[in-house]
């Protein structure tokens, strides 16, 4: 459990820096996602081949279906989120995106028969209060309903992604991440192809950030993420998942110079405090 927990946290920190790296690329959000998923899936395919692992997903059609739905949802969520970055800012969009775990938490007793404990519910209330504090001073969302809707839709797609990936029982780890990311690439490719017939023009200065976003943040990040969430409780994934938007907010302040008000700082404390409390209580209760 500890190894998977560490991998999950590292993945969240990488994902938290996505908005910062993407802000350096002078392309439309959907094209950034297309290039990101292409580079990331290509890396995972190469690693899978070099590791000489056997292909197993063809034996489990139900798992293939669940991973495909999860991958399509991930591609859609990223395209929606990246557009929201532009309209309402990286920090605010990231926090709204992470309403997704709340949806997952509420559905977990029905979909996965996981017990919804009082501590988990209490921790979520603390986390949600933190989000309210952070959004209370966000000037970017005022008068920009479109950006808010995009971020909200990305949260719904996030929930779909986690739920269907959790349903994959046999296909795990690198193979799972490889398929998931490749389907995300296909989703972005179909969208971009239907939207425009133009060849993507990339400035020479953008290549470094595209490769970082695709190979490190996406390829490595997705491997760490999808190789760990299958072994973690859904409610743990949901609660600790708020470390990603927290890191995104902090990076947006220090790197992009987005405004951090006292209410934002208080909100960040609530978010981190709620996540840490839930995990400390779980470890004490289980003795792990």
Language-model features: locations:
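Loop-to-transmembrane alpha-helix entry segments
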Residues: 61, 65, 97, 113-133, ...
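Hydrophobic/small/kink-forming positions within alpha-helical transmembrane segments
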Residues: 16, 20, 45, 71, ...
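Membrane-interface interhelical linkers
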Residues: 1-13, 41-69, 82, 110, ...
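Hydrophobic transmembrane alpha-helices of multi-pass small-molecule transport proteins
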Residues: 44, 48, 116-136, 154-155, ...
């Amino acid at each position: 459990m500890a190894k998977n927990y560490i991998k999950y946290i590292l993945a969240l920190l990488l994902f938290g820096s996505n908005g910062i790296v993407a802000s350096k690329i002078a392309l439309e959000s959907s094209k950034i996602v297309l290039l990101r998923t292409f580079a990331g899936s290509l890396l995972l395919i190469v690693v899978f081949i070099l590791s000489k692992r056997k292909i197993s997903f063809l034996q489990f059609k139900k798992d293939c279906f669940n991973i495909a739905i999860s991958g399509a949802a991930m591609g859609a969520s990223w395209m929606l989120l990246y557009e929201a970055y532009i309209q309402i800012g990286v920090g605010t969009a990231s926090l709204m995106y992470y309403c997704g775990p709340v949806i997952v938490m509420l559905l977990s007793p029905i979909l996965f028969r996981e017990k919804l404990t009082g501590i988990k519910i209490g921790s979520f209330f603390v986390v949600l209060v933190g989000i309210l504090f952070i959004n209370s001073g966000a000037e970017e969302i005022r008068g920009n309903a479109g950006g808010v809707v995009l971020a909200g839709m990305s949260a719904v797609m996030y929930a779909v992604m986690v739920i269907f990936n959790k349903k994959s029982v046999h296909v795990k780890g690198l193979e799972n991440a490889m398929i998931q990311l490749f389907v995300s690439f296909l989703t972005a490719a179909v969208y971009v192809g239907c939207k425009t017939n133009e060849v993507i023009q990339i400035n020479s200065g953008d290549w470094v950030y595209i490769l970082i976003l695709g190979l490190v943040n996406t390829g490595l990040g997705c491997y760490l993420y999808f190789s760990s969430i299958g072994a973690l409780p859904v409610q743990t994934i949901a609660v600790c998942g708020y470390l990603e938007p927290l890191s995104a907010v902090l990076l947006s302040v220090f790197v992009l110079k987005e405004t951090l008000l006292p209410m934002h700082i208080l909100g960040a404390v609530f978010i981190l405090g709620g996540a840490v409390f839930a995990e400390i209580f779980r470890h004490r209760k289980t003795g792990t």
